[in-house]
Amino acid sequence: MSLGFIQNDMKMIQRTGTLNFGNVVAESNRHLLGDDWTSEFSDDPNEWRVQKADIVMGCPPCSGWSVWSGPANRGPDSKAHEHTVAFMKYAGRVKPRAIVFECVQQAYTQGRDVMVKYRDMVEQVSGKKYDLYHVKENNLQVGGFSYRPRYFWVAVESGLKFSAVTPEPKELPRIMDIIGDLAEMPQTWNKQKYTAPSPSKWVKHLRTKNGMVDGHIGKTNIHAQRIEEIFSIIGNDGWEGNGDTGGALKKAVDLNDGKFPQKWIDISPRVIRKNFKLGFSQPYRWKEDHWCNVLTGSALDHVIHPTQPRLITHRESARMQGLPDDWNIEESRNYSHLAAVWGKAVPVQAANWIGKALKDALDGNPQGEPAELIGDREYLIDSDKGFSRHYAKKQWYSSPMETSAK
């Protein structure tokens, strides 16, 4: 999320929080994030150093609202919200002109009252009044590569006008527009030359000036080995786009005289018991003529490349999140949570979009239609209204290789 704000000529001065997650990666990319910031993390929010700032921004865990969480861990009383509460209390101590965090849209649709209480919490700590804006957006609509509906909680000094431009796309990219030029490159942590001379217009600006890119390597764990075993039997063309692992595995077993591939033998009784129905979160193959889907923290274990017989790589994940190819990955190769970083991050384009809206507001030049007043100093900006999966698919993805709107 930080890079999108920095792209709007903002300066980061501090990274802090309850979770020291991903900071190793940020430290390796000071050439893009600036070199004037400090980082300090503590379970005790009272230890977070307060500095003068115009904006406090954050990305606390969404698990308290996410449909991926079980009912016992989801809702207004979820323990995961402790991180958001800590964020609010810290923001109140800083007393900035604006505060923003990103979450899934259920935080608004199911937890609007909680969102208002967060504003009240900031006001109580800071002694300042803030106007609350609920901002709904979709990463694909605002210039990103994935169909990713999300929610930005935005609080600005009371009376400060805030709005955001609702984009009207003329074209939208497909996944191979984003990662196609990386597909056939050898896998390595080290820097290597691009092998595809002509990237799509969607990512041309993301390629490095020196023609070298690092971090194009995936996992080699048991999950990756099992996927490779399936491909070794059914072939690359034997696994169709949107096809799940259970279906591909059954095809492999049938072609292998009823025998499970070697790496699958130990779990074969469970697979048979479930009739090859491996559940909602099993690996599946993305379609090459489709948009990028949402990356989760387990993407490198669960996303099978659209055209290559393998799981996706770190660099491909970074690309899909809008990060430039000079975003250093290799230096963080020993960071145990590196694979989870990509799916836990806010896409650069979505961060850039909300960052620009905040900068325009702070500069006294808000853009876009006025927000809808829905409560006491409470507003709604419903940017992705009507931008449904059905609408996007019909408008831009109904023909196999067509990317322009009808």
Spans of features found by a protein language model:
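Short His-Asn-centered micro-motif
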Residues: 7-8, 101-103, 297
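Glycine-rich phosphate-binding loop and adjoining beta1-alpha1-beta2 segment
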Residues: 1-48
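N-terminal Rossmann-like NAD(P) cofactor-binding module of classical short-chain dehydrogenase/reductase
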Residues: 57
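C-terminal target-recognition/interaction regions appended to catalytic cores
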Residues: 212-406
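Class I S-adenosyl-L-methionine
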Residues: 36-53, 63-276
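A structural signal for well-ordered alpha-helical segments within the folded catalytic domains
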Residues: 11, 15, 85, 112-116, ...
